Amino acid sequence: MSAETKKTDVKKVVLAYSGGLDTSAIIPWLKETYDNCEIVAFCADVGQGSEELEGLHEKAIASGASECYIVDLKEELVADYIYPTIATGAIYEGTYLLGTSMARPIIAKAQVEVARKVGADAVCHGCTGKGNDQVRFEGCFAALAPDLKVIAPWREWEMVSREDLLDYLAERNIETTASATKIYSRDANAWHISHEGGELEDPWNEPTQGVWTMTVAPEDAPNTPEYVALELEQGKITKVNGEALSPYKALMLLNDLAGAHGVGRIDITENRLVGMKSRGCYETPGGTVMFAALRAIEELVLDKTSREWREQVGAQMAHLVYDGRWFTPLCESLLGASKPLADLVNGEVVIKLYKGQASAVKKRSPNSLYSEEFATFGEDDVYNQKDAEGFIRLYSLSSRIRALHGHNK
């Protein structure tokens, strides 16, 4: 944003606010830089934990905001963003269940809604200029509200460290509980928590136990496995151990159960959208169980070509979500096309939790294509094995013709 624009065009800004060091400094910085504009703080409750939200309204006002909106998005996040995404089979680079990525579209959408409500002419985020989130947020803003100005302080101000931010707040007598000794950058929601920075920036360093917060170390997990019974309807878990739960509450319970057995840890070096590689340690205990349960029922109900197609859709969807392209026609098309397959995912699964693993050990579905009568290795009355001969001749016909014409030499 140009210097001329700063003084004249920005009157009211809605800031994506967490109460952390960065956004606490952004509030006074915005007022100083943008001609004493009004700042409205917005916080999305996506299941990051009540301790993260405690005292947030008071803290925002004390930092200079005129108001602070805390919007509960937990159920919507799980029902309308997480479930549709995992129904496509989306996993980024084979391991990452897209915990941070899936939360960004709903946060950006809610931020735009608050901006419309209060009559703001700009939105602001605290994402760094090196990360993926700046692209995700601003891509969503462009799709939903291209008329709103976007302010990204980390691409404008001269502060480069936590010490700089602490000094900035101290000079303005703004209190903060943050310190310069924070080791890791963390981002949490109902689905997962990410850990980056500190000694993790060297991929030769093994994560210490101090990194992990949602899961116990697998080697310290109980020596006795735990079995969790799940019921699924149209690709969503509706009951856990016989108890009917909302999507969000089911996920929270599974987080507790799986986390106690060390399930859901990954340590990866991923390709960021902005071109560099980054190392992240992620914990997704409940999500790992949910993903395993859905895949178990899919094995029963999806035919071969449907599963192959779904794998292609999942790969494409993973990149769309990771790259911040949720509000696009292609994303909408993939989600819509995947729904008929998700609607077949009905049944029951028993998941075994043990020493970091979540394994589906029992599964059944009213939509199952599996038939024990046809699949048995014993004697049966429903399958004539001689029928396979004609199938094999036709299946291998092109290979036979190629060989007869001498093209295999």
UniProtKB/Swiss-Prot annotation:
Keywords: Amino-acid biosynthesis, Arginine biosynthesis, ATP-binding, Cytoplasm, Ligase, Nucleotide-binding. GO terms for cellular component: cytoplasm. It catalyses: L-citrulline + L-aspartate + ATP = 2-(N(omega)-L-arginino)succinate + AMP + diphosphate + H(+). Its EC number is 6.3.4.5. L-aspartate binds at residues 128, 132-133. The keyword Translocase does not apply. L-citrulline binds at residues 96, 101, 132, 136, 185, 194, 270, 282. It is found in: Cytoplasm. Coiled coil: none annotated. GO terms for molecular function: argininosuccinate synthase activity; ATP binding. It holds the Pfam family Arginosuc_synth. ATP binds at residues 16-24, 44, 126. The keyword Ligase applies. Pathway: Amino-acid biosynthesis; L-arginine biosynthesis; L-arginine from L-ornithine and carbamoyl phosphate: step 2/3. GO terms for biological process: argininosuccinate metabolic process; L-arginine biosynthetic process; urea cycle. Homotetramer. Belongs to the argininosuccinate synthase family. Type 1 subfamily. PANTHER family: ARGININOSUCCINATE SYNTHASE (PTHR11587:SF2). NCBIfam families: argG, PRK00509.1. This is Argininosuccinate synthase. It comes from Shewanella piezotolerans (strain WP3 / JCM 13877). The gene is argG.
